[in-house]
């Protein structure tokens, strides 16, 4: 499993309240959530994000409220992967459960710049900055988590397992 795209970069402690503000939690429609993704932090996010882009952030990404709406809005906006120094644990699990690829790599999260082009090999945990040529070793997903993400989330993974 791989991802490749342009970087949209944020800092530390990006919480679920700025990923998808609480005023939009009355819907579970992914397209509607995507239309408001990051708007309290980056009002131009929905205008500049392209399918396949990669979000990069610092420490504690996804902290705050335990809402699946946050990774759903990111995934539905077209982001193919989130790279961060660290993730809040509940966000990490919610991302896997809805099929949003994420990867922790402190060095990459610090070095990669906004608008860089990156490629991620999830099987190996490799992140390559195509703009600078530098390669980083992130933490690869265990095989069962890769299977969940490849199935587009836990629900589909279970459905596939039962059929």
Swiss-Prot record:
Pathway: Amino-acid biosynthesis; L-leucine biosynthesis; L-leucine from 3-methyl-2-oxobutanoate: step 2/4. GO terms for biological process: L-leucine biosynthetic process. It holds the Pfam family Aconitase_C. It catalyses: (2R,3S)-3-isopropylmalate = (2S)-2-isopropylmalate. Keywords: Amino-acid biosynthesis, Branched-chain amino acid biosynthesis, Leucine biosynthesis, Lyase. SUPFAM superfamilies: LeuD/IlvD-like. It is an enzyme of class 4 (lyase). Heterodimer of LeuC and LeuD. This is 3-isopropylmalate dehydratase small subunit. It comes from Ruminiclostridium cellulolyticum (strain ATCC 35319 / DSM 5812 / JCM 6584 / H10). The gene is leuD.
């Amino acid at each position: 499993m791989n991802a490749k795209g342009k970087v949209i970069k944020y800092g530390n402690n990006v919480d679920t309240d700025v990923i998808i503000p609480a005023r939009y939690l009355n819907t579970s429609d992914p397209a509607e959530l995507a239309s408001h993704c990051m708007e309290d932090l980056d009002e131009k996010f929905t205008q500049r994000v392209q399918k396949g882009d990669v979000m990069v952030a610092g420490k504690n990404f996804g902290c705050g409220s335990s809402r699946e709406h946050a990774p759903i809005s990111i995934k539905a906006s077209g982001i193919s992967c989130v790279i961060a120094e660290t993730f809040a644990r509940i966000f990490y699990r919610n991302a896997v459960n809805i099929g949003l690829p994420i990867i922790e790599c402190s060095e990459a999260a610090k070095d990669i710049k906004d608008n860089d082009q990156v490629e991620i090999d999830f099987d190996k945990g490799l992140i390559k900055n195509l703009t600078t040529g530098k390669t980083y070793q992130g933490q690869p997903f265990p095989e069962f988590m890769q299977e969940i993400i490849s199935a587009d989330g836990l629900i589909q993974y279970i459905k596939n397992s039962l059929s």
